[in-house]
Each structure stands twice: as C-alpha cells, then as structure tokens.
C-alpha cells in the first residue's frame, strides 16, 4: 500500500497553481533504482527458504542412509 502511495506521489506532483505534471522519467528511475529495501528483503526470504530446503533434503538423505544398514 505504501509503495502505491509513493508511486502516485512520484508520478503526480502538484505545483503552486494546482496543476499536475509528470515527473521526469530519469528522476523516477533513479529513485526506484536506489529504493530497494523490499527487493532485498525478498531476496533474503528466498535464500532462507532455499537454505531450509537444502537442510531438510540433506537430513532426509542422511536418515535414509542410516536406516538402510539396520534392515
């Protein structure tokens, strides 16, 4: 929700006369390139999920190999 509001603020600025004008695309792109906390947070979540998947897969395989000799 906050992202949408920030986007609207960037796209439409109101000058003193109350007339809307579009923000320069270079300014907008530079803002979004520098504003990446959500993207970084998502990358961290994905890495944590991948780590959990590898750990569970490794434990499953090790458990399987420990069960085989007892049969």
Curated annotation (Swiss-Prot):
It is a single-pass membrane protein. It is found in: Membrane. Keywords: Membrane, Transmembrane, Transmembrane helix. The chain crosses the membrane at residues 53-70. The keyword Membrane applies. GO terms for cellular component: membrane. This is Putative uncharacterized transmembrane protein DDB_G0281145. It comes from Dictyostelium discoideum (Social amoeba).
């Amino acid at each position: 929700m906050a992202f949408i509001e920030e986007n609207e603020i960037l796209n439409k600025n109101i000058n003193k006369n109350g007339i809307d004008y579009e923000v320069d695309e270079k300014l907008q792109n530079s803002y979004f390139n520098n504003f990446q906390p959500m993207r970084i947070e998502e990358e961290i979540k994905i890495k944590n999920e991948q780590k959990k998947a590898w750990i569970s897969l490794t434990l499953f395989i090790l458990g399987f190999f420990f069960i085989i000799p007892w049969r």
